[in-house]
């Protein structure tokens, strides 16, 4: 990890799992880190643990903002609070995700909660924070990055020939990704389609920066199989692995 003194980072879903440890590593490298979380109690407990287990962190180096990626209103409010606190953003990591369940749960954006959390909120937050990312990119020796935490799930749930339908904003895979069926496999397909959308956004955003000559790197990464207690469901994982892709 390079020295990140003077850099500002934002990590969504930073109170647990991959997000938690991402916040810690960035802060230990010297960055000032903000993370988004839905629950105040869990966020405050996470901050307390970070400082307790890493006594070298400076006061005010780790901060949290109430951001629920399943709510567009919450995403926009969180961006407003972040802009009120900082003038630039060097590192934006979209880590928060929805696992694909609750097929009938619609977000305030009018789309199913999985697509809202894993794609639309990512798009909205990135656009809202564009000026701050570009401010950081204009600095000498800038190394601005947008990292989208994705998944290899699409390769497990869909064939190479399958194509999502993103053509109709009022239906298809934007509003109801991969249909409205319930159950574990349907949830995995829903999750996969939302991650496909995230990957397409990643590629398009990088292409636009390149055309403009803006020195910002945008990447999607698959962290691999990571133990995270709320996700562990041995019976359903075994069921998924028995299914042909």
UniProtKB/Swiss-Prot annotation:
<comment type="function">
    <text>Short-chain dehydrogenase/reductase; part of the gene cluster that mediates the biosynthesis of the mycotoxin pyrichalasin H, a tyrosine-derived cytochalasan that inhibits the growth of rice seedlings, but also inhibits lymphocyte capping and actin polymerization and alters cell morphology. Pyrichalasin H is indicated as the responsible agent for the genus-specific pathogenicity of M.grisea toward crabgrass. The first step in the pathway is catalyzed by the O-methyltransferase pyiA which methylates free tyrosine to generate the precursor O-methyltyrosine.</text>
</comment>
<dbReference type="Pfam" id="PF00106">
    <property type="entry name" value="adh_short"/>
</dbReference>
<feature type="active site" description="Proton donor">
    <location>
        <position position="150"/>
    </location>
</feature>
<dbReference type="InterPro" id="IPR020904">
    <property type="entry name" value="Sc_DH/Rdtase_CS"/>
</dbReference>
<dbReference type="GO" id="GO:0016491">
    <property type="term" value="F:oxidoreductase activity"/>
</dbReference>
<dbReference type="InterPro" id="IPR036291">
    <property type="entry name" value="NAD(P)-bd_dom_sf"/>
</dbReference>
<keyword id="KW-0560">Oxidoreductase</keyword>
<feature type="binding site">
    <location>
        <position position="95"/>
    </location>
    <ligand>
        <name>NADP(+)</name>
    </ligand>
</feature>
<dbReference type="InterPro" id="IPR002347">
    <property type="entry name" value="SDR_fam"/>
</dbReference>
<protein>
    <recommendedName>
        <fullName>Short-chain dehydrogenase/reductase pyiH</fullName>
        <ecNumber>1.1.1.-</ecNumber>
    </recommendedName>
</protein>
<feature type="binding site">
    <location>
        <position position="18"/>
    </location>
    <ligand>
        <name>NADP(+)</name>
    </ligand>
</feature>
<keyword id="KW-0521">NADP</keyword>
<feature type="binding site">
    <location>
        <position position="42"/>
    </location>
    <ligand>
        <name>NADP(+)</name>
    </ligand>
</feature>
<comment type="pathway">
    <text>Mycotoxin biosynthesis.</text>
</comment>
<feature type="binding site">
    <location>
        <position position="68"/>
    </location>
    <ligand>
        <name>NADP(+)</name>
    </ligand>
</feature>
<comment type="similarity">
    <text>Belongs to the short-chain dehydrogenases/reductases (SDR) family.</text>
</comment>
């Amino acid at each position: 990890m390079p020295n990140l003194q003077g850099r500002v980072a934002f990590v969504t879903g930073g109170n647990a799992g991959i997000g938690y440890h991402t916040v810690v590593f960035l802060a230990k490298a010297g960055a000032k880190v903000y993370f988004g979380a839905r629950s105040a109690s869990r966020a405050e407990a996470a901050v307390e643990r970070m400082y307790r287990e890493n006594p070298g962190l400076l006061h005010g180096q780790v901060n949290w903002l109430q951001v629920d990626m399943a709510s567009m209103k919450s995403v926009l409010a969180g961006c407003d609070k972040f802009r009120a606190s900082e003038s630039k953003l060097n590192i934006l990591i979209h880590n928060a995700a929805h696992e694909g369940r609750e097929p009938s749960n619609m977000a305030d954006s009018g789309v199913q909660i999985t697509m809202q959390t894993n794609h639309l909120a990512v798009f909205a937050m990135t656009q809202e924070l564009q000026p701050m990312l570009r401010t950081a990119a204009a600095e000498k020796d800038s190394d601005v990055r947008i990292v989208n935490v994705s998944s290899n799930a699409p390769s497990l749930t869909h064939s190479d020939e399958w194509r999502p339908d993103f053509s109709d904003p009022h239906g298809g895979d934007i509003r109801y990704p991969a249909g409205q069926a319930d159950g574990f496999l349907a949830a995995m397909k829903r999750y996969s389609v939302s991650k496909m959308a995230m990957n397409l956004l990643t590629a398009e955003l990088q292409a636009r920066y390149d055309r403009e000559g803006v020195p910002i790197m945008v990447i999607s990464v698959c962290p691999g199989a990571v133990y995270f207690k709320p996700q562990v469901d041995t019976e359903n994982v075994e069921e998924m692995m028995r299914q042909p892709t």
